[in-house]
Design a protein with these regions (language model features):
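Glycine-rich FAD pyrophosphate-binding loop
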Residues: 20-42
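Beta1/beta-strand and adjacent pyrophosphate-binding region of the FAD-binding site
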Residues: 1-13
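Hydrolases whose catalytic domains are alpha/beta-hydrolase-1, hotdog thioesterase
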Residues: 16-17
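Active-site loop of classical SDR/Rossmann-like NAD(P)-dependent oxidoreductases
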Residues: 44-48
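A detector of helix-start/N-cap boundary segments at the beginnings of structured domains
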Residues: 41-43, 98-99
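Conserved N-terminal helical subregion
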Residues: 2-5, 22, 49-118
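Short, solvent-exposed loop/turn segments at secondary-structure junctions
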Residues: 12-13, 36-37, 53
């Protein structure tokens, strides 16, 4: 008997969960969101470490349009007086198939949403 799963919230976590349920189980699921539509406003940036990318690649994140993501090589840290404190070389944490990634939250949400229905 198939289990029925309710996922509350169509944010990054809820849509990621839905993608993994779809890929690895035969359970039925429904994603519930209190808003009438998903907010795909531009402007909110997120950062995903290499380990996050490895997980997302299991649901084909590696096939996302490369023009929509950025793979910085370093991160600079500044104090409140805008003085550089240090930098972090990200290349030593990257692998060929999983790199530190920045992108707009809307790009990730759109990918996760579309991936559920393909």
């Amino acid at each position: 008997m198939k289990k029925k799963i309710a996922i509350i919230g169509a944010g990054v976590a809820g849509l990621t969960l839905a993608n993994f349920i779809k890929k690895y189980t035969d359970h039925e699921f429904m994603v519930y969101e209190r808003e009438e539509s998903l907010s795909l406003e531009e402007g909110y940036g997120i950062q995903l470490g290499a380990n996050s990318i490895k997980i997302l690649n299991e649901i084909n994140f590696n096939k996302i349009n490369n023009e929509k993501v950025f793979h910085p090589s370093t991160i600079d840290f500044y104090n409140i007086q805008n003085e550089k404190i240090c930098d972090l070389n990200l290349s030593k944490y990257n692998s060929i198939d999983a790199k530190y990634t920045t992108l707009q939250r809307s790009t990730l949400i759109e990918f996760l949403k579309e991936n559920i229905y393909t």
